[in-house]
Amino acid sequence: MVNSPQNPRQDQRQDLDLTSFSATGGEPVEWRISDAPVPYPEAVAAMEARVAAIAAGEAPELVWLLEHPPLYTSGTSGKDSDLLDPRFPTFATGRGGQLTYHGPGQRVAYIMLDLKRRRPDVRAYVASLEELILKTLAAFNVRGERREDRVGVWVKRPDKGDGYEDKIAAIGVRLKRWVSFHGIAINVEPELSHFAGIVPCGVADPRYGVTSLVDLGQLVTMADVDVALRQAFEELFGPTRALVPEAAA
């Protein structure tokens, strides 16, 4: 989930204080949306460049919303044995976590924030990303929940049986010089069968599957989700400024 400086705190994430991530002063966070799918290597190169610029004080913070063409990514805890059917390109990545799928219909938000200026607390930052997802889902009357033993945000599925839950959003974070990158992925309307090519995030228990907003009966568009995501982000992290250009660097 996180590849970062060491942080010894062991509080449950739901109990962590999330109130101090809104920076005072400074520029609003740039908010950028790419309409066309962005190849993964291109996105990583752009993030790396932007993170270096933020750390050097040469660029403002950035949230970059995009979709990828179908692909799998493997985090620092990824296992080759969890790649069951490599039907799409697979990329090793420096973020925390294991294997996941990205593709059209999934809103990826790459979040590049200066945590040294805001609050250098890794676990609380991850909890704040969970809260960002929870608030976004709540805008569509979907109750997401944290799980201390499983990464991401989950929804209960009593229609499938007792104890069944589906993952609706993933989190994977990396830090360089206390600047965050990578981020979150919310399933809006992806092709859920593509997750069958992997063991998503290493969770093999058949009670735990994958879902999306549309799969749950919420007829929402990507634009709807973007509006809710931005509102939730500003509640947690402060003001944003929309940009038209698509390049993240």
UniProtKB/Swiss-Prot annotation:
In which broad location class does this protein mainly occur, judging by the first location in its UniProt entry? cytoplasm
Positions of disulphide bridges = none
Question: Which UniProt keywords are given for this protein, alphabetically ordered?
Answer: Acyltransferase, Cytoplasm, Transferase
Q: Which SUPFAM superfamilies match?
A: Class II aaRS and biotin synthetases
List ligand-binding residues for substrate.
R95, G96, G97, Q98, L99, T100, Y101, H102, A170, I171, G172, G183, I184, A185
The protein's superkingdom reads: Bacteria
GO biological process, alphabetically ordered:
protein modification process
Q: Which CDD domains match?
A: LipB
Pinpoint the BPL/LPL catalytic domain residues. 57-241
Q: Does the keyword DNA-binding apply?
A: no
Pathway terms, separated by semicolons: Protein modification; protein lipoylation via endogenous pathway; protein N(6)-(lipoyl)lysine from octanoyl-[acyl-carrier-protein]: step 1/2
User: What GO cellular component is one of the record's annotations?
Assistant: cytoplasm
UniProt miscellaneous comment: In the reaction, the free carboxyl group of octanoic acid is attached via an amide linkage to the epsilon-amino group of a specific lysine residue of lipoyl domains of lipoate-dependent enzymes.
Q: Relate the protein's function as given in its record.
A: Catalyzes the transfer of endogenously produced octanoic acid from octanoyl-acyl-carrier-protein onto the lipoyl domains of lipoate-dependent enzymes. Lipoyl-ACP can also act as a substrate although octanoyl-ACP is likely to be the physiological substrate.
Q: What is this protein called?
A: Octanoyltransferase
Species for this entry: Bradyrhizobium diazoefficiens (strain JCM 10833 / BCRC 13528 / IAM 13628 / NBRC 14792 / USDA 110)
